[in-house]
Amino acid sequence: MPKRVLQGVVISSKADKTVTVKVERKFKHPIYKKFVKVSKKYAAHDSENRYQEGDKVSIIESRPISKTKTWIVVNGK
């Protein structure tokens, strides 16, 4: 099974080797037919402390790195 890849924005980079990435998705509500925007935060591993707040990044699913980190930052702008 392929690993999931998500795109989001770094909202926190205060922790060492960890960034918090906010991922937004849009879907159409099944009853009201309105597009709803939902966001979720993921803790991702950034081994070189390269990314700062506001950077757009891609994260990929991986094995558990810690209690909350199961994603790795693969590239960004």
UniProtKB/Swiss-Prot annotation:
Name of a matching Pfam family: Ribosomal_S17
Gene Ontology molecular-function annotations: rRNA binding; structural constituent of ribosome
A GO cellular component entry from the record: cytosolic small ribosomal subunit
Keywords on record: Ribonucleoprotein, Ribosomal protein, RNA-binding, rRNA-binding
GO biological process, one term: translation
InterPro entries referenced in this protein's UniProt entry, alphabetically: NA-bd_OB-fold, Ribosomal_uS17, Ribosomal_uS17_bact/chlr, Ribosomal_uS17_CS
Family: Belongs to the universal ribosomal protein uS17 family.
Record's subunit section: Part of the 30S ribosomal subunit.
Function: One of the primary rRNA binding proteins, it binds specifically to the 5'-end of 16S ribosomal RNA.
Protein name per the record: Small ribosomal subunit protein uS17
Organism: Rickettsia canadensis (strain McKiel)
